[in-house]
Amino acid sequence: MMCRNNFALYSTRKPVASVECPSYFQQPEEDMAGIVIIGAGQGAGQAAASLRQQGYEGAVTILGDEAFPPYQRPPLSKQYLSGDLPLERVYVRAEKFYADKDIDLRTNTRVASLDVTAKTVTTESGEDIAYDKLMIATGSRPRKLSIEGSDLEGIHYLRTIADVDGIAEAMKTAKNLVIVGGGYIGLEVASVAATAGLTVSVLEMEDRILQRVTTPEMSAFYHQLHTGRGVNVMTKTGVSGFSGTSDGKVAQVLCGDTSIEADLVIVGIGIIPNIELAQEAGISCDNGIVVNDHCQTSNADVYAIGDCSNHPNPILGRRLRLESVPNAMEQARVACANMCGEDKVYAAVPWFWSDQYELKLQMVGFSSDGDTQVLRGDQDKNQFAMFYLKDGAIVAVDAVNSPREFMICKQLYGKQVDAEKLADPEVDLKTLL
């Protein structure tokens, strides 16, 4: 899974309820503790910038447990891993930006607890930091294997810059890479590694790769794409353990009665939202930190955005938790607007992307919402769009090397269309708007 991969979806299928957003706090500026942001991912970086763009002049503090300023995660499994993108270009903004905007960016700072009554954040070093408003942007962490040999050297997970630096270094000498998990993150890494000349195997326990996030037709397309580049894609294959060398390095991946040689393993089997701080503080959680349509939690002064939040989507008509950069960025803007006294609702059509080899896949909505598929373009030429309709209206698209179709679908989302015209490449999609 693009897990950020660029995205994954977890839905609780609960109806959207209307909620009230309380008015912004009113107190003298000299008495204001300011706004604290826990987490230093892309959403957190956007939030800090948005607060200054909103004209907020109080203290803004970002607390991040990594050694880096806010950065983009999507390139990690693609251009950064391949070496095509330098570290500085992974950063959301140059480090100088935060000082220039009087934003207190604290890296290597892990938060130990929250006290929503006292309105303080306590770091692992024991420092108490007061806040008027708090944003939780703690993201997620990789789900880990707990099986025989899973602690051997050479078994990696991909989530952070440090993770990718370790993988990139290992790839310099590795010959046989096994990727456990056939989601977007795993497939993106497979494309980088295969291009670099490694022998690559992808192991997926489900019937097909990408089973949780797309249709059988798209799974088959990407299966063929990877096998055509020499990747050994094995579905219906679960991992039972790992065996190692005498010095504790991984040597084989065990799959029941069979084994696969490996001197490097990357595991991508999903993520776990980082909600423990909120849970322990008594904030409502259910498959994420529960927020309303203003990105506000059950505590009036605490907001949550990104991977860790479970939000209502009025367009889809249900609650869901998204692992998606566009979602985190837009939620950051909405939450900050509301923190600053506006009344702004988060209502966006989800969209995602994945880069594999020379193909860019761009997605709008969820294919599982459709009851009809309409193909436009030529799959054999690696340039097509698969539209998904429900009761004649567009609810999703998977666009491969078809940016125009992707952009048009954003505008056509939810609208009734003529399926025959949609499928005809001679028909200008703008005529359907």
Where are these regions (language model features)?
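Beta1-alpha1 glycine-rich phosphate/pyrophosphate-binding loop at the start
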Residues: D31-D104, V192-V213, I408
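FAD-site-proximal beta/loop scaffold in flavoenzymes
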Residues: D151-T173, G244-V334
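Catalytic nucleophile loop
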Residues: G41-A44, G183-G186, C336
